[in-house]
Each structure stands twice: as C-alpha cells, then as structure tokens.
Amino acid sequence: MATLQEEISRRRTFAIISHPDAGKTTLTEKFLLYGGAIAQAGEVKGKRERAAKSDWMEIEKQRGISVTSSVMQFQHGGYCINILDTPGHQDFSEDTYRTLMAADSAVMVIDGAKGVEPQTRKLFKVCALRNIPIFTFINKMDRETRDPLELCEEVERELGIDTYPVNWPIGCGKEFAGVYDRDKRCILHFTDAGHAKKAGITEIELDDPALVDLIGQARRDTLADEVELLGAGRDFDLDAVRHGKLSPVFFGSALTNFGVEPFLNAFLEMTTPPLPRVSDADEVDVYSPEFSAFVFKIQANMNKAHRDRLAFMRICSGKFERDTEYFHVQSGRKMRLSQPQTMMAAEREIVDEAYAGDIIGVFDPGIFSIGDTITMPGKKFRFSGIPTFEPEHFMLVSPKDTMKRKQFVKGVEQIAQEGAIQIFKIPDSGFEDVVVGVVGTLQFDVFEYRMKNEYGVDLRMSGLPYEHLRLIRECPCDVKDLMLCSGSRVLEDFKGRKLIAFGGEWSVGFLTKHNEGLILDDWLSV
C-alpha cells in the first residue's frame, strides 16, 4: 500500500492554456486517449456527431468553444493526472485565471502558423506571476507553419522566457514526417495519422541508412544541419524549468496525434508534483498529514441529470477521506463531506479518498464562496484570496414573465455565487431587476442561455452605460442621500456590500468632491 508521500508525489495537476482555436481542447482529448480514459477521441467526428469530451455545457457543444473550466482525472504511466481544461475565449478569462490558481504547471498550446497570440500573452503572464513550470506545445504541424526556430524566438521575445526545443519537427504540412528527440538522439517517425485512435510510431537513429528511405536524402541532410545548430544553443536545465524560467518546447499535431504521446510522457517526467501553498499563517507543506483545500470554482447545473451545485476544491495538503469532519474557515462551521466526486467533464464518480494535488467536487448547500479555505477542525488559517476581474459591460435584466419571479431569483442567486458573472441588486427594489456585469459580452449570451435552459426564465435585457465599479468603504450618510451624477447608480452585491457604478472616470471625481467623507475602494478580491 502506497504511503501518503508516494501518493502525493505521483500527482500531476496542470492547466492547458491557449488563444482560441489553437487546438487546446483537442490536445486535452488526446491526453485522455493516450491515458486510456477514453477509447476514441470525439474531435474528428465533428461537433454535431460527438462533442469534445471536455466540453459539457450544451452551449459549448453548439458553438464549439469552451466557456467553463473542465476538470478531468486519469491514470497514466504510474502518475495520477488532473487536467484543468480552460476557456480560451478572452470573454471567459476570469474562469481561466481562477483555474490557473489551482494548477501546479501549465501547458501552453501555440498554433504553428500564427505563433504567440493576444490571449496567450495574457494567460502566460498569470502563470509567470506564480513562477509555475510552463511547457510549450507548438501545434498544427500537419499544416503549413512558420519556421520552428522563428517560433521559438518569438516565444522568448514576446513572453520573456527562455526556450529549449526538446524535439524538432521533420517538415510540416503534408511533409510532416515526425520529430527528432534530442534526449534519445533518435527519430520518431510517424507511420500513420491516429486521429481518433493512437498514432503509429517507428523509432530510428539519425545515422541509420534506412532513414533516407523514410524521409528522403534532402530532409535527412536538413535535419542533421538543424540538429547541429540546436546543439550550439543553451543546455537543458530542469531546475530552471521547474521554477518557470525555461520552457521546454515540443512540436506536434493534436489532430493527427503526431507528437502527442512523446510530449505527454516527457511532460510528466519534467513537471513538478504538488507545490506548497501560501496561507495567512505560513507556507502549507503538501506532505503534511493534515488535510487542507481551497475552493476555486463553483458550478450549478452541470447537466440536466444533476440539478445541484458543486464546489470545486484543490487539495493543498494531506489526504481527504470521505465522511470525515472538516472545518470551513470562513463560516466557522464544521461539516462532513459525504459525497466527494472526481470528474470527467460532466461525468462523476464518488471517491472515498483523495490527496494533495487532486481536484474534488463537493455538494454546495449555499455556504461556499470562491477562495474559501477548508481545513481540519482547530486549524483556522486561510489560503491567499483569488482576485476577480472588474466588469466592463453591464445590462439591466428582468424576467419577461413576472410569474417566473421565483425561478428568476433562484437562477440569479446561484449564478452570482459561481462568481464568473457578477450580479448586483438595486437597493430597495427587491428582485424586479438586477444589474449583470461581465468582462466580455459573450458572457451575456451564456447568462441568458443558462437562465432559459436551466431555470426556465426568458429575460428582458437592456444595456447600461457603466464602465467602472467602486466599493463604498465609508459613507457619511445613508447611501440613498448621496449626490450622484448622471450615469451613476448605487448597487449591492450578494455579500451585502454597497457599490457605485460609473459611466466614466470623471464621475468618480465628481462623487468624492460633492460627498465629503465618502471613501471608495477599487474592485476588491472575492
């Protein structure tokens, strides 16, 4: 029977990040394929026939994008792997940001034809702030791509991180024949495209005369020159990789499976087991026998068979055991978590135990919030909070059918608690209308879709001119008596805090100037 340290040491918890359409979800599926978690990948059959395994919300399947973070666990090569597949669309960057807080490393997927794109830069910065290992997979080598050396140089120039090509592509597009493994000093020649099944691979030495028969003399000579050029570059430094200073680069095609298995195996060997976490008391040792975790995501109605709400927890230390009594620090309540679950997108499985590095889902009766800490009874430390993004777009929302008010209130309250979409009440107006704030406008579509399909409520939505929010820290009078300028409004969040929405920065100055003693704070962490 494995010890606590052995179980934790074999955990690998990582997020996959990319710009939209770089192939992130396809690569995730192929990891599941090679890990034996699925028998056949769904990507190649098309969205209409079979949606991606990691996309569970109906709107994701219809639009072909990921709008929520999916959690998947599987076993491979002696490792227990937790993949966090994140939304690539910029409108859902907040959910991605929170997910990255739960990851120990990141896989950055880059389109070989396009290079580093805007969303890639944004997500990379979040990873870099935490100094977690970042691995680069340059995808779509089965299509015409830019020069591999140029792509590596762009990653270094645009993102400010050193790179080390672990393998090197042999051709691209229709000529993509395989990769050269620099560590093993051999060619991995791909004999047939895997698509929904595993790709065929033949290993052959660079100086083997038979290589010319496989790839031709010209490509063999070009490869030899490129390998010699790479040898004159920087050396591989595993310590630099694990501290986020050096990004190992791999080339391949997630669609055809070329290069996926070598990448997965090398990544699992190079990346770190679970990392220590910072709390307000001290750094928490992952190998401590005492359980601790934090909530990084809340999701209601993951499918129609489960009309419930799950809180996703990242275990930070020790071992979780089902039916054991734990302590919710924020509420000061003891609780017994009797139905913990691991996930494969929307599919669930009850687990009896889990370890540091694992992600579990627990039923949320309405007490959890993003960033909450769960510990053993008697331990009251808190993990560092998870910031939220300030909304940039606002709408006034009400139910079209006033008879659906109860369903409207339930939907609004549950979606507000998830945190990805900010919802505010208008003081003293009940729930006739609410103000919805989002980072990107596509989130309005998701909100409207969920209210209709999960709660049966059609919405009336109209745009509002607000651009900024400020939290009222101190108010010298009743908020109803504040002197507001045109285009400003007092709102209330679901924690009972009062805020003011503004149409522009000049409005902030007007308010503080004409309301002596009023103190406003910028958008705060959850």
Annotate each predicted stretch with a short phrase.
Residues 1-526:
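Structural and coupling elements of P-loop NTPases
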